[in-house]
Design a protein with these regions (language model features):
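Catalytic and substrate-binding clefts that recognize carbohydrates or anionic sugar/phosphate headgroups
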Residues: 1-158, 168-170, 174, 181-186, ...
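Catalytic core of carbohydrate-active enzymes
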Residues: 28, 38, 63, 78, ...
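Extracellular structured ligand-interaction cores
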Residues: 37, 85-89, 96-98, 106, ...
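Glycine-rich, histidine-containing beta strand-loop boundary motifs that form or position
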Residues: 42-44, 55, 94, 102-105, ...
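Short, hydrophobic/amphipathic alpha-helical packing segments
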Residues: 66-71, 84-87, 178, 286, ...
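A residue-level signal for conserved active-site and pocket-lining positions in enzyme catalytic cores
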Residues: 90, 147, 184, 224, ...
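Short acidic-glycine loop/turn motifs at beta-strand connectors
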Residues: 92-97, 260-262, 569-570, 579
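Aromatic- and carboxylate-enriched substrate-binding clefts and catalytic-loop regions
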Residues: 190-496, 531-532
């Protein structure tokens, strides 16, 4: 059962697609106050578990810390960070009472889950203008499925998007991208996509291509497609301020950019220099910006990734002016050396909270200050693209994922987990985010395999790939100036060929499970406790996940480990894809086990009485031969495999 409570005058986020009448009275759970903003307080028992919050730090059980829904350009995913790129305001409390809460509020929202008081859950925001949805069900899984039905069907990508992709910030010329693609093809390592970071553009201007580096971009796109490679360019949120740049001039002429309070176009520095932000919360501006994707689609592009759309800001003219004044007042013509406060002031120029209060959106003729609806920007930038795709190429699927998001964006694209680091702990963070994101409708997701920032290691890339084998988005991505981490850069390339090859062997199963989850408003990845509700130990397990109804995954995430400990809540079949192409299968009883997993092996566990389809390795998804599909798992088990053309919208 779902009940909706309305407080004040909420902003319509379009997160919910089902019409639900407002309930009278107050919710049956917790205590609500609307004095000095909004607060919800609930007393938890010691054994209560709290799930959700989508893209967020720490564990699957969110107890013991504080989290903030405030889409942030935050590349340092350390445990002290309370906000990441997304705002996913859905939680499920499981314990003495089991219920879910979705707070449909687009501004900054704080979840104190046993941080200030260990027994108290407290949700607060500065404005008492929101919708609160209270969902009751017998189990957390039941509650999630109810929520998923009211937020609409998850985005469905083209089937090629289930292949492996290579990316790196620093690929600039046609030869750079060609070299990456050829490095995989020449070493017989499967690949479907090469991603194009910001350097493919002309001066970082959206919807442009550097003509010097790509003199005939359409021919180049076709050349890559002949190799089985889809090029996937990045699009950023900021539009460069430059006379003669038609996107800029059109936006100014039609008043499609976000405004300062005085009505002038708001200015912020990002990669191109000074930029304007398209007012994607305005329906006309959103349609205008979305239509610009056609410029690259007309050249043969069929996939994009949206970035910097929190929106991120390096600085603003106002912030720079304030810094200059601070330096003048405190350091000019003075003998004392500047203290560390000067460095703090410089660093504070980027993503300054005050700057998010300096610009406005035009929503149905009403001027809305950005910070009040901040978490909707990335969502609506991706919505702009998704709505445009339906008009540009009706009936065709496009690959689309974003960095920033809010519940509702899951209908238009997926997300990647942002600028992680080449740290072993981030394999585990990657794993733990998967079910939380699925709870909020984000099925097409994955992390930068091998880590984006910092220098990676061969063993880290292999172990991370062995998790990435199972995530819908499987992409190796790294930062400018870091160690090159393409699979062919390391010794014993055959190990990478094998591990990535396992992904292609599993595509018949992974695609089927993804589509079932999308079409049935279900989760693809779940915590063990969602299925094994009477198993107290399953609630404690946070480094193993159920995938579909057939398998459990338990990656190795510790350097130098030869294997790992696992907990089996029932008898399962331990399966390893071995580097010689064979598959080992061993029945293990319910309980605790240590399993050996070599660096070049991919493990999974098949649940009792189940089986899954596997195919032979292919170099691209379209080359997977259905005639090679066979079943592995328990003898006599059946599997209902979903398949389609992988191109047409549903």
């Amino acid at each position: 059962m779902i009940q909706k409570y309305t407080y004040g005058t909420p902003f319509e986020t379009d997160a919910i697609v089902t019409s639900i009448p407002t309930s009278e009275g107050t919710p049956a759970y917790g205590t609500i106050s609307t004095e000095n903003g909004f607060s919800f307080a609930y007393d938890m028992d010691d054994n209560d578990v709290v799930y959700g919050l989508g893209e967020s730090n720490r564990g699957i059980n969110k107890r013991g810390y504080v989290y903030e829904s405030n889409c942030s350009d935050q590349p340092n995913h350390t445990e002290d960070k309370i906000s990441l790129y997304g705002a996913h305001n859905f939680i499920v409390i499981s314990g003495k009472q089991t219920f879910g809460l979705f707070v449909d509020y687009p501004g900054k929202l704080k979840f104190d889950i046993g941080y200030t008081l260990s027994s108290q859950l407290k949700i607060t925001c500065e404005d008492a203008d929101l919708y609160l949805y209270v969902i009751e069900g017998e189990t957390p899984y039941d509650i999630v499925k109810q929520f998923r039905k009211i937020i609409g069907r998850s985005y469905i990508p083209p089937k090629f998007a289930f292949g492996f992709g290579q990316s790196r910030w620093g690929y600039t010329t046609a030869d750079d991208f060609r070299k990456a693609a050829d490095g995989y093809r020449e070493n017989n390592i499967p690949i479907d996509m090469v991603y194009m970071d910001i350097d493919y553009m002309e001066d970082y201007k959206d919807f442009t291509v550097n003509q010097e580096n790509f003199p005939d971009f359409e021919a180049y796109v076709n050349e890559m497609k002949e190799k089985g490679i889809h090029l996937v360019p990045i699009i950023d949120a900021g539009v460069k301020v430059e006379a003669g740049y038609d996107v800029y001039e059109e936006g100014v002429e039609k008043n499609y950019f976000c405004k300062r309070e005085d009505g002038s176009d708001f200015v912020s520095a990002v990669w191109p220099g000074w930029t304007h932000f398209p007012d994607v919360l305005n329906a006309d501006a959103r349609a205008w910006f979305g239509q610009k994707y056609e410029r690259l689609i007309s050249k043969g592009i069929d996939g994009f990734w949206n970035d910097m759309n929190e929106p991120a800001m390096f600085c603003t003219p106002e912030g720079v002016a304030e810094l200059k004044e601070y330096i003048k007042d405190n350091f000019m013509d003075k003998e004392e050396a500047p203290g560390f406060t000067l460095g703090d002031k410089v660093n504070a120029l980027a993503n300054n909270p005050e700057d998010y209060k300096r610009f406005y959106h035009n929503v149905n003729g009403q001027k809305i200050r950005h910070d009040k609806v901040h978490n909707l920007f990335g969502y609506n930038m991706t919505r702009a693209a998704g709505e445009a795709f339906e008009k540009i190429a009706p009936g065709k699927r496009f690959l689309m994922f974003s960095r920033s998001s809010y519940v509702g964006m899951h209908r238009y694209g997926g997300i990647w987990m942002g600028d992680n680091k080449s740290w072993w702990s981030h394999i585990l963070l990657n794993l733990k985010m998967l079910p939380s994101l699925n709870m909020c409708g984000f099925l097409y997701t994955g992390a930068d395999l091998g880590g984006f920032g910092a220098d990676t290691t061969r063993d880290l890339v292999l172990r991370w790939l062995a998790l990435g084998v199972f995530t819908p988005l499987m992409r190796n991505h790294s930062a400018l100036g870091t160690r090159e981490q393409e699979a062919y850069q390391f010794e014993n390339i055959e190990d990478f060929r094998h591990v990535i090859g396992v992904r292609y062997r599993l595509v018949p199963y992974l695609y089927s499970e993804y589509m079932k989850a999308a079409l049935n408003d279900d989760m693809m990845f779940r915590p063990l406790a969602f299925d094994y509700t009477d198993d107290a130990f399953a609630t404690q397990v946070e480094d193993q996940l159920l995938l579909g109804n057939e398998i459990m995954i338990a990656p190795v995430y510790t350097q130098n480990a030869k294997g790992r400990y696992v907990y089996l809540p029932e008898e399962m079949m331990f399966v390893k894809f071995l580097p010689d192409g064979t598959i080992s299968q061993e029945i293990l009883e319910k309980g605790h086990h240590y399993v050996e997993v070599a660096l070049n092996e991919v493990p999974l566990f098949i649940r009792k009485g189940k089986a899954i389809p596997v195919a032979d390795v292919a170099q691209t998804v379209k080359d997977i031969n259905p005639a090679t599909i066979r079943m592995i798992g328990y003898e006599g088990a059946e599997y209902d495999r979903y398949d389609d053309d992988g191109v047409s919208t549903l």
